[in-house]
Amino acid sequence: MAEQVLVGDVGGTNARLALCSLQDGSLSHIKNYSGAEYPSLEAVIRVYLEETAAKVSSACIAIACPITGDWVAMTNHTWAFSQSEMQQNLGLQHLSIINDFTAISMAIPALKDEDKIQFGGEAAQAGKPIAVYGAGTGLGVAHLVHSGEAWMSLPGEGGHVDFAPNSTEEVMVLEALREELGHVSAERLLSGPGLVNIYRGLVLSDDRVPENLQPKDVTERALADEDIDCRRALSLFCVLMGRFGGNLALNLGTFGGVYIAGGIVPRFLEFFKASGFRVAFEDKGRFHSYLEPIPVFLITHEQPGLLGSGAYLRQKLGYKL
């Protein structure tokens, strides 16, 4: 039996853990745990190892927060821990704690054709830079570059760059939201809560009072064609996803492709396909022709965070991806 390592994908609500084969990166024994039911990440890992009777010497856990040193404090959870202490407590020879979008970016080289849907552009160019972003609870961003024999993820907090409007409607939304929020980042519009902000901004810019809606309300009403404001909001969301993706492509010349990680887009996939997303992606004036061949993909793999955590660790331990 091939040696296995522990991999994880931890968000503000759930912790997903699995075993990953060092030989081929395949995943097994995938389990999901509610973070609210455990006092710490270490406690969840101990339960998982006991339930699976797994013996591992190495682990890689992806977490939805910035990783800047030994101490890790989750953004949307009370869990906080020292990486070195947890490694020692669990008796691991190696422990890597990485950002969730570092993991998702590292999953991309392992994706098969059936794990993604293409939106325009030509074939991805092998070995060229890649960008990945995803709108969920927040807006995650990472880049991936090939260096020598290895893939290198370039994580950051790109979701918090300034929102840059590019139409009269977008300027009006920005002005309405600025009065409520102060600084308006891209994440304030490109996320689940951001979809509601777009709806609010559109209604407020018309000098009307918005309803108190949740993201799913906006999506459901838009798809049912029951509410013109919600439909406008969802349409603008798709356009802004395109503009933001085009900006990422320009930043690093991502002829290896721009990837959208799951998040909320799959909930309205057909609407997204028919939206102004791709036109907005290429809408860069003189650089339209530069962006035209760059493909955009939606990741449909169910566990890209786990897959990427495994890929990150396998490469770190000397395995070629």
Swiss-Prot record:
Keywords: ATP-binding, Cytoplasm, Glycolysis, Kinase, Nucleotide-binding, Transferase
E.C. designation(s): 2.7.1.2
Binding site for ATP: G8, D9, V10, G11, G12, T13
Subcellular location: Cytoplasm
Lineage: superkingdom: Bacteria
One Pfam family named in its UniProt record: Glucokinase
Main location: cytoplasm
InterPro entries to which the protein is assigned, alphabetical: ATPase_NBD (IPR043129), Bacterial_glucokinase (IPR050201), Glucokinase (IPR003836)
BP GO terms, sorted: glycolytic process
Catalyzed reactions per annotation: D-glucose + ATP = D-glucose 6-phosphate + ADP + H(+)
MF annotations from Gene Ontology: ATP binding; D-glucose binding; glucokinase activity
Gene3D superfamilies: 3.30.420.40, 3.40.367.20
Transmembrane parts of this sequence: none
SUPFAM superfamilies the UniProt entry points to: Actin-like ATPase domain (SSF53067)
GO cellular component, one term: cytosol
Family of the protein in this entry: Belongs to the bacterial glucokinase family.
Protein's UniProt name: Glucokinase
